[in-house]
């Protein structure tokens, strides 16, 4: 509640000058005397890139967390993968943005998906890479907290590993994993620098992913 109040209080100057149309207008004219501003373009771009990034990141985070916390739990390989995932979370946004600019955009152009490589898809892909470590790390913790007694009981009844994952691990870890994806989505919404570098420089609502 305090955060909502703080945001509302900080937006009062904008609301008093431009009204609520600031949220639904796609005009952006900073010319002196005109001062016609609208945030719709930024809102749409943020929602599109964040949602698409989450769609890409969830399967990657889910599979990685199962790999680390269940299939190879306690092994050196799981430790290495877990360390690499944690390192990805510490890389600055500008590094991701530069990597996307110099590596990912040319790959998109070579694939014939976009003439310049910029767009919603490229931005969402970078965002997905950025939020996977957050979702994976929290999911690892949640899966590791599932009692071993439940899993051993399922194995004793003849369940396969896939059945144990489906009937024991997922039901017990669902709430924690969902929370991890929500936090990752919040991280995607709050990211600006890497997206600004890759989304393009067109002042218009996108009609496609490229």
Regions from the language model: what does each represent?
Residues 138-139, 155, 161-196:
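Transmembrane alpha-helices
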Residues 7, 42, 46, 83-90, ...:
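Residue-level signal for discrete positions within transmembrane alpha-helices
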Residues 8-53, 74-78:
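Periplasmic/extracellular loop-to-transmembrane helix junction in inner-membrane transport proteins
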Residues 2-12, 98-106, 186:
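A structural signal for multi-pass alpha-helical bundles of membrane permease subunits
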Residues 5-8, 58-66, 95-98, 122, ...:
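Membrane-embedded alpha-helices of multi-pass transport/permease systems
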Residues 53-85, 106:
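Transmembrane-helix boundary motif in ABC transporter permease subunits
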Residues 188-210:
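Glycine-rich helix-loop "coupling/hinge" segments at transmembrane-helix boundaries
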Residues 86-127:
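Generic hydrophobic transmembrane alpha-helix motif, especially the helices
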